[in-house]
Each structure stands twice: as structure tokens, then as C-alpha cells.
């Protein structure tokens, strides 16, 4: 069965793999399964078939950046929960929770522990 979403995989590069895994495990309050494959370390956000998922990746060619595309991660029921943990986990909040519209919800932008610029989205 094919994926039904426009995005089916993402990779968040890390120079310090353990620090990055701790950062995302902290802000999302969940353990991320890890593996070493094809010369790279990976920590998986989901391992369910056909989920939109991705990894934290550390290895050749994986270079953190705060330029380029902006990936919006699921902030759950209310993005305040993971956003409140960003600075505790070693990141920086760039844009606090901001309303897009009643129909689209809210977003916030942060820099993770590795220097990547990402966003969180939630309806509440």
C-alpha cells in the first residue's frame, strides 16, 4: 500500500547523536528506538508501517542547518506541552505559540540541540 500523505519520511541531522536523541525524547516525552545502519546512527520517531515518520540521523552527509525547508512536527493536542520542554532540553524557542487561524490552528518555531530550525503545530 502506498503512503497517502505528501510527506512520508524526514531526516533531522545531528552532530551529537546522543544529545539530539535526548532532546527529542525530552520534548516529546517518549523513547526513540535507535539503530546503526549503513554507517549512520538513527533514532526513529515511529516504526509503524505507513506512518509519516523519520529519524534523527548522525553520519556522513548529515549536517544540521537552520536554513532551508521548515519541517512542522506534530505538537499533539496542544503544542505548549513539547514547546515548554525545548529550552530545558537544550534548544531555543525562536517564535512562541502563534495562532494561524481558527481552521488551521497554532505553530511555534524552535532551534533544536543541534542547530536545526523546526516548527511544532497543533490545533489548540
Provide a role label for each language-model segment:
Residues 20-24, 86, 115:
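Conserved active-site tyrosine of GNAT-family acetyltransferases
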Residues 42, 53, 107-109:
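Short hydrophobic/aromatic beta-strand element in the GNAT-like acyltransferase core
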Residues 7-15, 61-87, 106-111:
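Vicinal oxygen chelate
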Residues 2, 11-51:
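Core segments of cupin and vicinal oxygen chelate
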Residues 10, 101, 120-124:
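Short beta->alpha transition motifs characteristic of CBS
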Residues 45-49, 110-113, 123:
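Active-site beta-strand termini and strand-to-loop segments that position acidic
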Residues 37-41, 101-106:
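Short acidic/glycine-enriched loop/turn segments that link adjacent beta-strands
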Amino acid at each position: 500500500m502506498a503512503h497517502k500523505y505528501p510527506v512520508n519520511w524526514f531526516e533531522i541531522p545531528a552532530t551529537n547523536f546522543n544529545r539530539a536523541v535526548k532532546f527529542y525524547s525530552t520534548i516529546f516525552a517518549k523513547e526513540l528506538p535507535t539503530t546503526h545502519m549503513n554507517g549512520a546512527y538513527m533514532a526513529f520517531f515511529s516504526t509503524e508501517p505507513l506512518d509519516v515518520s523519520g529519524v534523527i540521523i548522525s553520519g556522513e552527509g548529515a549536517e544540521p542547518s537552520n536554513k532551508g525547508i521548515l519541517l512542522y512536527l506534530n505538537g499533539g493536542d496542544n503544542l505548549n506541552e513539547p514547546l515548554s520542554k525545548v529550552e530545558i532540553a537544550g534548544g531555543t524557542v525562536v517564535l512562541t505559540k502563534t495562532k494561524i487561524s481558527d481552521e488551521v490552528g497554532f505553530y511555534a518555531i524552535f532551534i533544536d540541540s543541534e542547530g536545526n530550525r523546526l516548527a511544532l503545530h497543533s490545533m489548540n
